[in-house]
């Protein structure tokens, strides 16, 4: 069996992703998007909204778009940085060429493409679960070692979650009172989002630091579920858990040997997180707003992001827009609130989603052409 086949669904005619699942995800995504914008725009003066969007300052619009692109490109740069570092240790033993057509693709640009592909599939799947498997597929297809690709993607994902949790906890500790006042009825959702992210980080850290303990706990949980007739006995579940813990353990071993790489990834991830929060402030300035500090706008946007990050909705659509409209109502003037949401959300999600769709389509065409 080829390496790439070990990390992706079995191929079928028309693509490696099951077509029915693909159609269902698309319908769900478009349905939620339609309901979201219908709810938000119903009863609004569309001509005024259009005029406000049209009057957005071009320099600030470019700056906001640049921050959106930086968000995705930063992940690609981390993939490239880690993958290149891991390949250096194997170059003396074997040379692995990653080729699409006749060009090497283990470059910064190729890794940025992986990031756009991951963003697209994460955006159209519930809880952003579809991105990494597809990234892994293309990385393996390019000739990267499956073990290296897995460690790189897991490291990026873990640091992403850890930085998000640290930011969320820091905001709660130092700005808890202000958050509760500003978020009002959405404050419990913020606490839920932070709690869910914390649980994920705790589970992942346990898998990395105490893999045997995790396996024992899982075996006990599985036994209870089988006893209650919730699950049927299936040895493949334990195999998946052992693979899961083994992969994270490999990531830990590699990071222990390269602590400097870990520091770089943490720093870049922090900047990546802040870029998407700062984007909203660029929109705020671009719409001619004043009176609210950059710290407050960034804090509010970060709270929205943390609250919806783990919700099982494609792209966290619907709840993100509704929470934004409520939280930023005191910040933007009445005529600028909806336009600001359309611009900021349009740039940090839909614009990147379209870019990711374009990159994905181009890569899909190239893969089919090679086959």
Annotate each PLM feature.
Residues 2-3, 9-47, 51, 118-231, ...:
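Transmembrane helix-loop-helix hairpins in multi-pass inner-membrane proteins
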Residues 74-116, 283-300:
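Membrane-embedded helical hairpins/re-entrant loop segments and their flanking transmembrane helices
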Residues 16-88, 92, 102-105:
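Anchoring transmembrane alpha helix of integral membrane proteins
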Residues 163-164, 244, 271-280:
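Core segments of transmembrane alpha-helices
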Residues 86-90, 284-343:
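Membrane-interfacial helix-loop connectors
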Residues 55-65, 253-267:
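Membrane-interface helix starts
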Residues 48-53, 139, 244-256:
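A short amphipathic helical element positioned immediately N-terminal to and/or at the very start
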Residues 227-248:
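Short, membrane-interfacial amphipathic segments enriched in basic
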């Amino acid at each position: 069996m080829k390496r790439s086949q070990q990390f992706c669904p079995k191929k079928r005619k028309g693509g490696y992703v099951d077509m029915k699942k693909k159609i269902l995800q698309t319908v769900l995504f478009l349905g939620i998007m339609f309901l979201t914008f219908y709810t938000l725009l119903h009863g609004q003066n569309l001509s005024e909204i259009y005029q406000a969007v049209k009057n957005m300052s071009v320099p600030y619009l470019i700056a906001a778009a640049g921050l959106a692109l930086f968000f995705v490109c930063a992940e690609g740069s981390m993939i490239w940085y880690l993958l290149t570092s891991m390949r250096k240790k194997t170059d003396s033993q074997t040379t692995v060429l990653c080729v699409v057509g006749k060009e090497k693709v283990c470059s910064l640009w190729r890794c940025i493409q992986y990031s756009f592909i991951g963003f697209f599939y994460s955006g159209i799947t519930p809880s952003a679960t579809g991105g990494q498997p597809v990234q892994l597929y293309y990385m393996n297809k390019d000739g990267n070692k499956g073990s290296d690709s897995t460690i790189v993607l897991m490291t990026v994902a873990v640091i992403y979650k850890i930085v998000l949790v640290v930011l969320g906890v820091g905001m709660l500790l130092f700005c808890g009172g202000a958050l509760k006042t500003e978020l009002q009825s959405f404050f419990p959702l913020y606490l839920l989002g932070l709690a869910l992210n914390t649980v994920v980080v705790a589970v992942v850290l346990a898998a990395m630091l105490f893999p045997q303990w995790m396996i024992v706990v899982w075996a006990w949980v599985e036994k209870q579920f089988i006893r209650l007739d919730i699950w049927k006995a299936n040895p493949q579940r334990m195999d998946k858990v052992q693979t899961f813990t083994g992969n994270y353990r490999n990531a830990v071993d590699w990071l222990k040997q390269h602590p400097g790489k870990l520091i770089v990834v943490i720093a870049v991830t922090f900047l990546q997180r802040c870029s998407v929060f700062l984007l909203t402030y660029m929109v705020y300035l671009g719409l001619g707003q004043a009176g609210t500090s950059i710290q407050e706008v960034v804090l509010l946007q970060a709270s929205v992001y943390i609250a919806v990050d783990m919700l099982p909705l494609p792209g966290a659509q619907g709840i993100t827009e509704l929470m934004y409209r409520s939280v930023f109502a005191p910040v933007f003037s009445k005529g600028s609130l909806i336009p600001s949401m359309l611009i900021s959300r349009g740039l940090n999600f839909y614009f990147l989603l379209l870019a990711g769709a374009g990159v994905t389509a181009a890569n899909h065409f190239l893969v089919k052409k090679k086959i």
